[in-house]
């Protein structure tokens, strides 16, 4: 049976359209900088917020009455949920989706039940993918919701919990491989601490390092060609999480020799919780060579928690997309909408409104960012700002031709007295705004 009988396939109608369910800017096959818009953006809808979350929060029960969420046999409901999901993906016209293992299959009462349920649902997902042409951007394992993970998964003080996490990640990686997923994500939802009074930081870090090495080894064992991605987040649900931000993740990867093996999946709302801009986190990951993929959403500036709202700022997303284009675009990654409608958005149609608006925001941001790249006044001004480092003296310093003493003697001997030069921040902000608000 159809779950969205009143919704037709969403189509591009152009900026002048008054239809609430039409794309004004997302023209999937429009060529931007030599390739279609859909290939630049690689947009995905997430399973968990869209089809699993019941509209609950810490103060109240779920407000949604989705037809795929009513009481019944767990496996039958999972099968129906998959049908609803792929009907939604197809009508939305989105090319990818993402899931946690327990989003798509009931966990059951034992690891054996979990394995059997998950295996059955992978059969269904594979069939849906073949019939629809929709692809898996990434899969992952939910190693944070089950009470056994209250003190973490890989960082847990109990090695048997560590082993249970390994069982889920093993299963989810194999499923991602079978479904031809482009990436595998590792989000350490409870890899952190509530208090240092009962926490051995060194031990937990070593446990995490060992777990990640096992994941990398398994990637090669099964021949997975996609990227492994850690998703940084500073806190929530724990007080402090070990994958705080992109720079912290890079330091962790370097410690365990994994900086060439694992990249990051950056979420906008996680960046702001860490006290950074989304732009900062993407630029940092690019500069460190670990940029992988994006969870596109936004937080509320007045709230200090993860609100996971749909992205709606062309200004913010243009700067982020500019950084991605300058870095050569996505490899295996893409823009996954880790976003959810509000608890009062009760109609199934609201799911479409949220995604359509967000897809248009990314499309318009891509066009604005592409224009910035083609003009690239920002890059020319950066080149001027750092021009001294391209001169013989600057090159000699970077090449190690000076030590601290000889460089100091050079400064004294030549009576160096360089003058500060304007950073032109206001002018640069005006340049960006001319592209965004043209």
Swiss-Prot record:
Cofactor: Mg(2+)
Keyword Nuclease: no
UniProt cross-references to PROSITE patterns, sorted A to Z: XYLOSE_ISOMERASE
GO biological process: one example: D-xylose metabolic process
Active site: 100, 103
Domain of life: Bacteria
Transmembrane segments: none
Sites where the protein binds Mg(2+) 2: 267, 270, 306, 308
Reactions accelerated catalytically: alpha-D-xylose = alpha-D-xylulofuranose
Sorted UniProt keywords: Carbohydrate metabolism, Cytoplasm, Isomerase, Magnesium, Metal-binding, Xylose metabolism
MF-aspect GO terms: magnesium ion binding; xylose isomerase activity
SUPFAM superfamilies assigned to the protein according to its UniProt record, in alphabetical order: Xylose isomerase-like
Cross-referenced Gene3D superfamilies: Divalent-metal-dependent TIM barrel enzymes
Assigned protein family: Belongs to the xylose isomerase family.
Record note on quaternary structure: Homotetramer.
Annotated NCBIfam families: PRK05474.1, xylose_isom_A
Protein name (database record): Xylose isomerase
Species name: Pseudomonas fluorescens (strain Pf0-1)
């Amino acid at each position: 049976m159809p779950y969205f009988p009143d919704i037709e396939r969403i189509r591009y109608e152009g900026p002048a359209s008054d239809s609430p369910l039409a794309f004004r800017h997302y023209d999937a096959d429009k060529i931007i900088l030599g390739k279609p818009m859909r290939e630049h953006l690689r947009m995905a809808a997430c399973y968990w917020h869209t089809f699993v979350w019941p509209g609950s929060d810490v103060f109240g029960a779920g407000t949604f009455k989705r037809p795929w969420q009513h009481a019944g046999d767990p496996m039958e409901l999972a099968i129906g949920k998959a049908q609803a999901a792929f009907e939604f993906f197809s009508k939305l016209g989105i090319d990818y989706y993402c899931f946690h293992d327990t989003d798509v299959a009931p966990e059951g009462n034992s690891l054996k039940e979990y394995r059997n349920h998950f295996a059955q649902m992978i059969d269904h997902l594979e069939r849906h993918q073949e019939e629809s042409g929709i692809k898996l951007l990434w899969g992952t394992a939910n190693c944070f919701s089950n009470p056994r993970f209250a003190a973490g998964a890989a960082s847990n003080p109990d090695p048997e919990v560590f082993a249970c996490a390994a069982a889920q990640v093993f299963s989810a990686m194999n499923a991602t491989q079978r479904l031809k997923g482009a990436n595998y994500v590792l989000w350490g939802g409870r890899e952190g601490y509530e208090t240092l009074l009962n926490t051995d930081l060194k031990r937990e870090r070593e446990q995490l390092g060992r777990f990640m090495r096992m994941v990398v080894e398994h990637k090669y064992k099964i021949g997975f060609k996609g990227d492994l991605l850690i998703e940084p987040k500073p806190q929530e649900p724990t007080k402090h999480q070990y994958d705080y931000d992109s720079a912290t993740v890079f330091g962790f990867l370097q410690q365990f020799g994994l900086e060439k093996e694992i990249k990051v999946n950056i979420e906008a709302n996680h960046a702001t919780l860490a006290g950074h801009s989304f732009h900062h986190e993407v630029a940092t990951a690019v500069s460190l060579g670990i940029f992988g993929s994006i969870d596109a959403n936004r937080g509320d500036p007045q709230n200090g928690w993860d609100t996971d709202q749909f992205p709606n700022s062309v200004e913010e997303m243009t700067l982020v997309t500019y950084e991605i284009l300058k870095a050569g675009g996505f490899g295996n990654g893409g823009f996954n909408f880790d976003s959810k409608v509000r608890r009062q958005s009760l109609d199934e149609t609201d799911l479409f409104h949220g995604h359509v608006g967000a897809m248009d925001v990314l499309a318009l941001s891509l066009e604005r960012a592409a224009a910035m790249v083609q003009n690239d006044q920002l890059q020319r001004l950066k080149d001027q700002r750092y021009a001294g480092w391209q001169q013989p003296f600057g090159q000699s310093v970077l090449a190690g031709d000076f030590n601290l003493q000889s460089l100091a003697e050079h400064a004294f001997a030549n009576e160096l007295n360089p003058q500060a030069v304007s950073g032109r921040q206001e002018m640069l902000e005006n340049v960006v705004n001319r592209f965004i608000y043209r």
